[in-house]
Amino acid sequence: MTAQVTCVWDLKATLGEGPIWHGDTLWFVDIKQRKIHNYHPATGERFSFDAPDQVTFLAPIVGATGFVVGLKTGIHRFHPATGFSLLLEVEDAALNNRPNDATVDAQGRLWFGTMHDGEENNSGSLYRMDLTGVARMDRDICITNGPCVSPDGKTFYHTDTLEKTIYAFDLAEDGLLSNKRVFVQFALGDDVYPDGSVVDSEGYLWTALWGGFGAVRFSPQGDAVTRIELPAPNVTKPCFGGPDLKTLYFTTARKGLSDETLAQYPLAGGVFAVPVDVAGQPQHEVRLV
């Protein structure tokens, strides 16, 4: 697919991640720089906020301002004016795990994964947080990534990046997962890894490619049908934005790139916008009460 690609913020993020569309603006993080960023497409304004630790995702809250965010120390509440407050600690600090990617389903449940911060073992898990508490839904994961839900709410997707595998699950109305199966298995002999994902309004999965200079759109059957090329090697996650949800925004990363590669791809670590024909799903909000 020959796409119109625009770098909307040449941020040079070390590890740009977690983009969401909220309040007609784009929010995302730089995990390693401990930053939360906010881009206003209508005006071009940009704002940045410091986090006290590695910050990995944001999710808006039903009936409230601010966000639920993942920090290395656990799940926190964040407001730009008042800062951070701890909601819950997820795992024992001795594991050296941290939250990674997250999504919110139509019922307001927060789904998030944890991973070993050094990317050295499979100590990560997948969790679901709702009004009843936090439940572990899957475990023994190397790098948790790409949680997202189909438009009908019946299929849940989740990726283990180091295993190069996107999994699908049946998702019940009560939030239980079953029938775990391989949705897409990436080739094991190269350096392209599936990273974050998002599902569009037709039920097709857009997956960012770490080491792959772009993203791929997969059909509900797992067939690759479209590819977008970006001028950055490590693409981390897409999200839909714009007034009609027909703009795909992508975060990227400079992490792991040599000086030679960075000189060849100076926009690595930037945020990119690409118009698409099929709209995304609205950003859901976390239900805390």
From Swiss-Prot:
D-xylono-1,5-lactone binds at residues 98, 100, 119, 145. GO terms for biological process: L-ascorbic acid biosynthetic process. The keyword tRNA processing does not apply. Fe(2+) binds at residues 17, 145, 195. The active site is at 195 (proton donor/acceptor). It comes from the Bacteria. Gene3D superfamilies: TolB, C-terminal domain. GO terms for molecular function: calcium ion binding; gluconolactonase activity. Its cofactor is Fe(2+). Its EC number is 3.1.1.110. It catalyses: D-xylono-1,5-lactone + H2O = D-xylonate + H(+). Keywords: Hydrolase, Iron, Metal-binding. Binds 1 Fe(2+) per subunit. It is an enzyme of class 3 (hydrolase). Involved in the degradation of D-xylose. Catalyzes the hydrolysis of D-xylonolactone to D-xylonate. Belongs to the SMP-30/CGR1 family. This is D-xylonolactone lactonase. It comes from Caulobacter vibrioides (strain ATCC 19089 / CIP 103742 / CB 15) (Caulobacter crescentus). The gene is xylC.
